Each structure stands twice: as C-alpha cells, then as structure tokens.
C-alpha cells in the first residue's frame, strides 16, 4: 500500500491531475474540435468526477453500532482496539482507528477506508474518471493524428498552446486511464463475485491451506457469493440510483445472505474464514481449536493441523492472517487492516 508522510498528499495529487486535465482541455483543446453539446457533456462529466471524489473522501465507510452483540449461533469476532464484538466481514482500519463494516481496503488517494457505506461513492468516482478521461484520450488521439497529417502546413496555422497541451495530455490521460481502469476492473470483478479485496486475499490464503491439507476444500468455499446481479446490487445499490451522487448500497453491513456453503447440513451457520476461533472479551480462548470446530458443527479434521507443537505449530503460525503473504507479497496490513481482532 502506498503511504505518504502526510496522508493528504495522496488527495492533493489526484486533485492537481483532475484539475489540470479537465480545465485546460475544456479551455484550450476541446472547444476547437467538438460541438458545444459535447463540450457541455465533458464539463458536466468533469463536475461529476469532482462531486463523486469529494463524497468518496468525506463519507465514512460505516462502523458497527456500539451495542452490537453477536448472534448466539454465529461467529464471534472481537476487536482488542475497540474492546467490542464486531460483525462478520468487519476489520479494524489502522488509518481511521475504528472497525469498518465490510472493509474493502484503505485508499491513499481518498485518504479514506473503503467499506460498506462508501463503496458506491468510491466506485462512482472510478467510473466517472474512466468515462471522462477515456473520452478525452480518444479526442486527443484524433487530434494528434490530424496534427500529424497536417505536419507539412505552416506553423502559424496551429495554436501552439493547443498543440503542446495535446502532446503532453495524451500520455498523461493514457496513464490515468490505464491505472484507474485496472483498479476499476479489479473492484468490479470482486464486486461480481460478492467479495472484497481483503476477502480476495483471504481466499488466496485459504487456498494455500487447502494445498497443504490444513483445510478441506468444502470449508474453503466462499459463502457470500450469491448471484451476479445480487452481488453487484448489494455492493453499490440499484443501477438506477448508482448514478445519483447519494446512491447507497443494500443492507446494513452487519448481516449478510450466504450460499449453501455457509451452512451445515442442519442449517447452522458456519464461520468464514474456516480457521477462525471464537474468543471472549478477556482475550481468553473459549476452547481450543478442535473444540471450537465441534461447537460449530464441523469435523475437527477440516483443520488437520489444529493448535499443536513443533513443526505443525510453526506451519500454522506461518499461515496465520497477520503473517501470511500472497504471491504479490501483500500482507493483511497492506490493505489498511490493523490486525487486532481475534
């Protein structure tokens, strides 16, 4: 995760880029080559970039209610920092110092943690940037090609300011479109699968446990993947309200629908990740790992290692959430999570 000595530097940089590309293009480049209607649409889209960006910065991601009590038959997650129980899919944000509902990641470019409540605002910002900069990039490509075809004409026929800005803005707009586009695709793919970036990392860790035969394949299945459109609507709300600056996600960020892999044959809910063990507020295990699995209606062999000694203990420690890295070298802390929950 990118960090800055002053976190607001991460906000100032995008502001400079957005202002420079949108303002100078609308004044010096586009008026000479597009209709007034197109120019108006570009200005409106640029305004939506600013509006969605400001909202993504100021709207909090959502935190559990102070009086939250976990269900008796559900998983019990306890945050040592907040000294309180928290719902499933909730993590403690190191930057904000609070637990965040359905935390996705901490974004240095908004200086905000992305969670259940502000995910639609964050996604709206990405989409508006992609559309606005994508349009500008296409227009710049057309303009540069025309300048190349007319390169033999006298220089006094060209507006030098426009030519210089077009040449500079072409690679700049491509860079913005490429980097933001990759992030948009990553977030959208996760959204389609009903998963957050943190949970995607968690799935990679669980898959490594399956390969080492520490967790069974049945227990490794992700329980929150319901159906394509349901997953999308749960994350960003209705497609009609998504385009409104105040559009909200579905649900409360506390309880979530699960697929069949999230329940036992008797209909009892299973915890995820499967190697989670319930703890009480005094940070004392309610019981050892195998007893905890039995209490949740699972077979102890789904975690073949358990809490043992020697080599197996070292292996289990390696796969713990605060130690493990994925193939890209990312740890849980790289998503802005302060590992204080047990």
Swiss-Prot record:
GO terms for cellular component: endoplasmic reticulum; endoplasmic reticulum membrane; Golgi apparatus. GO terms for molecular function: protein-cysteine S-palmitoyltransferase activity. It is found in: Endoplasmic reticulum membrane. The active site is at 107 (s-palmitoyl cysteine intermediate). The chain crosses the membrane at residues 9-29, 39-59, 125-145, 163-183. It catalyses: L-cysteinyl-[protein] + hexadecanoyl-CoA = S-hexadecanoyl-L-cysteinyl-[protein] + CoA. It is a multi-pass membrane protein. Residues 30-38, 146-162 are lumenal. Its main location: endoplasmic reticulum. Residues 77-127 form the DHHC domain. The DHHC domain is required for palmitoyltransferase activity. Belongs to the DHHC palmitoyltransferase family. PFA4 subfamily. HAMAP family: DHHC_PAT_PFA4 (MF_03199). PANTHER family: PALMITOYLTRANSFERASE ZDHHC16. Mediates the reversible addition of palmitate to target proteins, thereby regulating their membrane association and biological function. This is Palmitoyltransferase PFA4. The lineage of its organism: Eukaryota, Fungi, Dikarya, Ascomycota, Saccharomycotina.
């Amino acid at each position: 995760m990118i960090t800055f000595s002053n976190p607001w530097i991460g906000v100032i940089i995008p502001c400079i880029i957005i202002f420079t590309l949108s303002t100078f293009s609308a004044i010096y480049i586009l008026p000479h080559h597009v209709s007034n209607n197109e120019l108006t649409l570009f200005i409106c889209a640029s305004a939506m970039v600013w509006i969605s960006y400001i909202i993504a910065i100021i709207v909090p991601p959502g935190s559990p209610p102070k009086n939250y009590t976990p269900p008796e038959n559900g998983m019990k997650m306890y945050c040592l920092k907040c000294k309180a129980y928290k719902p499933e899919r909730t993590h403690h944000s190191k930057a904000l110092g609070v637990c965040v509902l359905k935390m996705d990641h901490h974004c240095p470019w908004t200086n905000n943690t992305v969670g259940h409540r502000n995910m639609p605002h964050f996604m709206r910002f990405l989409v508006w940037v992609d559309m606005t900069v994508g349009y500008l990039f296409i227009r710049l490509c057309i303009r540069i090609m025309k300048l190349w075809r007319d390169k033999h004409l006298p220089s006094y026929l060209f507006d030098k300011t426009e030519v210089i800005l077009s040449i500079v803005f072409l690679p700049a707009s491509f860079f913005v479109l490429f980097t933001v586009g990759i992030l948009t695709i990553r977030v959208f793919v996760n959204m389609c699968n009903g998963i957050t970036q943190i949970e995607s990392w968690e799935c990679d860790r669980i898959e490594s446990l399956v390969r080492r035969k520490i967790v069974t394949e049945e227990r490794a299945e992700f329980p929150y993947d319901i159906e394509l459109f349901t997953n999308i609507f749960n994350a960003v709300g209705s497609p009609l309200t998504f385009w409104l600056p105040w559009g909200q996600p579905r649900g409360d960020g506390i309880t979530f629908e699960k697929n069949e892999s999230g329940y036992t044959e008797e209909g009892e809910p299973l915890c995820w990740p499967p190697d989670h063990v319930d703890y009480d507020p005094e940070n004392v295990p309610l019981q050892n790992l195998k007893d905890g699995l039995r209490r949740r209606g699972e077979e102890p062999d789904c975690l073949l290692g358990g809490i043992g000694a020697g080599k197996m203990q070292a292996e289990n420690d390696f796969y713990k959430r605060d130690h493990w890295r994925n193939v890209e070298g990312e740890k849980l802390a790289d998503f802005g999570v302060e590992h204080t929950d047990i």
